[in-house]
């Protein structure tokens, strides 16, 4: 599982791009239009996902000099907030495309890709940080956020500049994809 996790960690973005392109091709081939209802459902999911990603990246990336695991901000409630954000973005894109049959496929592919990635990352971080990280992962959930924050939060803070420095590519990709889906609808 660790070898698969390392491979999926290195290739996860490429695989998600391929999946999104597949959605576009299938939508276009089957003459799917991107309805207003689809947009009304997908837009909040995409915004939620991107907001979670910005928050988590802003906390994680702005404090690289700390020699302790990040357990503040969204990491106090969930071990993998960036991946949860990515999940909501991907789900929003699938719904935007109007391919409801793709939802179970997306769920399966997402977890097949990210579960080994997370196992690999957690193994790497446990070796790097030792007992503090092992205690953290035994307390904080992996996928579903906890209402009660982790009691031993780190001093990591959120810096918006760092968040947008890392996330501008994802934001542009989402905007570009939304524009492309809109154009495909109008061209039909």
Residue ranges and their predicted role:
Residues 1-72, 87-188:
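Membrane-anchoring alpha-helices and their flanking helix-loop junctions
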Residues 75, 80-85:
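Glycine-rich acyl-CoA binding loop
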């Amino acid at each position: 599982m660790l070898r698969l996790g390392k491979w999926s960690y290195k290739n996860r973005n490429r695989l998600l791009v391929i999946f999104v392109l597949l959605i576009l091709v299938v939508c276009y081939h089957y003459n799917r239009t991107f309805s207003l209802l689809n947009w009304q459902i997908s837009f909040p999911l995409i915004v939620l996902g991107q907001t979670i990603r910005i928050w988590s990246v802003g906390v994680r990336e702005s404090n690289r000099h700390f020699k302790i695991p990040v357990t503040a901000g969204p990491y106090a409630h969930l071990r993998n907030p960036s991946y949860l954000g990515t999940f909501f973005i991907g789900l929003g894109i699938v719904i935007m495309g109007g391919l409801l049959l793709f939802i179970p496929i997306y769920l399966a592919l997402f977890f097949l890709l990210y579960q080994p990635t997370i196992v690999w990352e957690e193994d790497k971080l446990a070796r790097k940080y030792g007992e503090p990280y092992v205690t953290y992962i035994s307390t904080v959930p992996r996928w579903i956020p906890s209402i009660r924050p982790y009691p031993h939060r780190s001093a990591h803070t959120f810096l918006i500049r760092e968040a947008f420095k890392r996330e501008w590519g994802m934001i542009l990709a989402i905007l570009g994809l939304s524009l492309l889906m809109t154009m495909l609808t109008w061209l039909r």
